[in-house]
């Protein structure tokens, strides 16, 4: 019996050390050397203080800022510890009511009849940092008015912040809301 148990225990300990310790430490070390910013969460600093990550959405309020997608992560949204969608199906009355209410409020706030889908639907993670370029352009009149910026100049800033498809063919062009708002803060002083 001991003759059969020993190889099993050696295998368990060996694989635990290899897959639970050596492999993760090796990959972390390689990532730190090759992609240090990415390996540490793609953090964004302002005046020496970490204010967010390129990879995790944040809630922005007020007319001076572009708004991201709504978040279902956590009680008040944008809670990275509670990442996840609302789990409401497309025919769920609560989801339909929320989308209609959000669409109505956005139509009144933005002065436009129909808001883009990005502004009324959550992402699967609830923490999507990106919106479509169309969604950013939809918000230009409100942000331009609040900041006292010419709409054409603001559209140009948005154009500069559009990130192309990954590898030229994966996904759709997107705008990172945090990075766009930081560019606005640097260029606008009103």
Curated annotation (Swiss-Prot):
Gene Ontology CC terms, in alphabetical order: plasma membrane
Keyword annotations: ATP-binding, Cell inner membrane, Cell membrane, Ion transport, Membrane, Nucleotide-binding, Potassium, Potassium transport, Transmembrane, Transmembrane helix, Transport
Stretches that traverse the bilayer: 10-30
Stated name of the protein: Potassium-transporting ATPase KdpC subunit
Superkingdom of origin: Bacteria
An MF annotation (GO) of this entry: ATP binding
Role according to the record: Part of the high-affinity ATP-driven potassium transport (or Kdp) system, which catalyzes the hydrolysis of ATP coupled with the electrogenic transport of potassium into the cytoplasm. This subunit acts as a catalytic chaperone that increases the ATP-binding affinity of the ATP-hydrolyzing subunit KdpB by the formation of a transient KdpB/KdpC/ATP ternary complex.
Disulfide links within the chain: none
Xref: InterPro entries: KdpC (IPR003820)
Record's keyword annotation contains Cell inner membrane: yes
Mode of membrane association: Single-pass membrane protein
Pfam name, any one: KdpC
Sequence similarity: Belongs to the KdpC family.
Database matches in HAMAP family: KdpC
Localization of this protein: Cell inner membrane
Organism: Brucella anthropi (strain ATCC 49188 / DSM 6882 / CCUG 24695 / JCM 21032 / LMG 3331 / NBRC 15819 / NCTC 12168 / Alc 37) (Ochrobactrum anthropi)
Quaternary structure note: The system is composed of three essential subunits: KdpA, KdpB and KdpC.
Presence of keyword Transmembrane helix: yes
